[in-house]
Each structure stands twice: as structure tokens, then as C-alpha cells.
Amino acid sequence: MAINLTGRSLLTLLEYTPEEISFLLDLSAQVKRESRARIVHKRFAGKTLAMIFEKRSTRTRMAFETAFAEEGGHPIFLSIQDIQLGAKESIEDTARVLGRMVDAIMFRGYKQETVETLAKYSGVPVYNGLTDVYHPTQVLADLMTTQEVFGKLKGIKLVFMGDGRNNMANSLMIGCAKMGMHYVVCSPAELRPDENLMQTCLTIAKETDSKIEVIDDPEKAVDGADVIYTDVWASMGEESKQQERERLLRPYQVNEVLMRKTGKKDTIFLHCLPAVKGQEVTFDVIEGKQSRVWDEAENRKHTIKALMIATLL
């Protein structure tokens, strides 16, 4: 069956089928091959992308901006200081105005409700570049990187070490459930995943032959892991909780000893970045031969370009 994503938003991967995600990953691989071969297109010529940032960004901004501009489009950066979003003008009205002026909107900020409202009222594709609860474009890059290394996603065991409630843990759970992977959240009891999301993903897992577990013992969790993934201990906006998180998460640091506990020589390490080396991951691991974080970072651009090609053309 032909896949047509024209006009679609990406708010979470819950709204995408496994077949649609596979389509995006295949298109991402094609985009990457074209990029490496210096094949130039102008697929976004005459189109404009509004990029709204409440939170700072390196990879997300660079990926969206360069991907759109390379294809002949006009990306516009809008910080929260530049526009009236939710201040003197409602989010609904901002969405209506932008929808009359641009072809797509990217939002990176705090509340998931904001990106959902933009999608509801703008009438154009809206992309979630990160909220407090989800980071779907990052997971597309994670899945692409994993597939590049292992040649498949089905049955691959991915272990997330750290804060089981954060946006990466949530989004990876969805992505792994959709793609038939074995997903383990390894976190202390205080930072376990949201129960409602767990139940949603467990329901998906029954249909895709996925497996989802929550384990608090790091050594038990990583046994047989193909991918070990971690994120900063205190996410953006949670800096005041840094000391508490260090106390809770120090036993969940990804180091060389833990990497060896997988029992596999080809286990890879992933991190959405930025990383605090020496906290959630040691220097030796992130800079070591098992690390694929720089491929993963590059793949942000290819997956985001593929997403925009699929939804805008």
C-alpha cells in the first residue's frame, strides 16, 4: 500500500503506523545518500518554515534550518522574545496567523499542549522539535542510526538508562513499541515512566511483537542489550533538581563496566546530546569505539529533511 503523508503533522509517534515510520526511515536513508553524493534538489523552493523556539537548541535548529534551506526553502527563526505566542496573543490566534503566511511550523518548547494547539489551528503541518514530554524527531534519528548499524529494528534490544519519565524515555518507548523492538527503561522507582503511557505502549507492543520492561537493576537491564541509551540527569527547566538527580541516578551512569555487562561486543551507545561527560556517561564511553552519537546527530538532519519532504510535497 502506498504511503502518503502529505499535510501530516508530527506531534508524537503515536499517530504514525509502523509502516509510515518505516517509510520515513527509508526516505531518510535516500536523503542521506543524496547528501553524501552532493545531489542538490530544490524541493522546498517557494516554501517557508516558521521555527518557534522557547528552548535553546543546537541540533534541532541546525537540522531544520539547514535541511529546509538546502532544498530552496526559507526558514524563519522565531524566539519567544520575537513573537506574541501566549502573551498578548493567544496560541490559537498565533497559529491562525502563521498558517496564512507559512507552509509549516516547527515548535520547540515546554508544553505539549502548545504544539498540539498550533497543529489544530494553523492548518499546516506542525513538527514537534521537543516538548517536556515528547521528542519524536530525535527518535527518528535514533531508529535510523540503529537500523544502519544492525540492518534491522525488529527484535533489537534498546535500554534507556536514567530518568524514566523524561521526553526521551517516553518517545523511545513509543518508537520501540511501534517497531517491534525490545525496550527496557532502567531507572530508580522515583523516576519510573508514566503509567498511562506504559499501558498505551504495551497495547501497541501486543500488535507489533514488541517487548517493554521497567527494571531498576542496571546489570540485569543491560544483559543482551544491542543499544544502551542515556540522557542528561536534569532536563532543561529542571536545573534546580540537579543535586537530587545526581543522588538518584549515579548508579545508572553508563560506563565501560556497564557496557561490558551486555555480553555483546557489538553493543552501541547512543545519546540525544548535549551530554554532561562524567555524569550520565563517562568520557571513555561517549568517545569510544562503541559510540554512535555523532552519526546519530548527523541523522537528525536527514530524518528531519525526509519528514518535511514527506509531509510538504
Swiss-Prot record:
Domain of life of the native organism: Bacteria
GO terms classed as biological process: arginine biosynthetic process via ornithine; citrulline biosynthetic process; L-arginine biosynthetic process
Query: Which residues are recorded as binding carbamoyl phosphate?
Result: 57-60, 84, 108, 135-138, 272-273, 300
Name the keywords, alphabetized. Amino-acid biosynthesis, Arginine biosynthesis, Cytoplasm, Transferase
Catalytic activity annotation: carbamoyl phosphate + L-ornithine = L-citrulline + phosphate + H(+)
**Where in or outside the cell is it found?**
Cytoplasm
- EC main class here is transferase
Is Transferase one of the keywords UniProt gives this record? yes
Q: Name one GO cellular component term.
A: cytoplasm
Q: What is its main location?
A: cytoplasm
Q: Name the positions where L-ornithine binds.
A: 167, 231, 235-236
| Stored InterPro entries | Asp/Orn_carbamoyltranf_P-bd (IPR006132), Asp/Orn_carbamoylTrfase (IPR006130), Asp/Orn_carbamoylTrfase_sf (IPR036901), Asp_carbamoyltransf_Asp/Orn-bd (IPR006131), Orn/put_carbamltrans (IPR002292), OTCase_ArgI (IPR024904)
Instruction: Tell me which EC number(s) this protein carries.
Output: 2.1.3.3
Single GO MF annotation:
ornithine carbamoyltransferase activity
- Which pathway does it take part in? Amino-acid biosynthesis; L-arginine biosynthesis; L-arginine from L-ornithine and carbamoyl phosphate: step 1/3
The role this protein plays is:
Reversibly catalyzes the transfer of the carbamoyl group from carbamoyl phosphate (CP) to the N(epsilon) atom of ornithine (ORN) to produce L-citrulline.
Family, per entry: Belongs to the aspartate/ornithine carbamoyltransferase superfamily. OTCase family.
> What's the protein here called?
Ornithine carbamoyltransferase
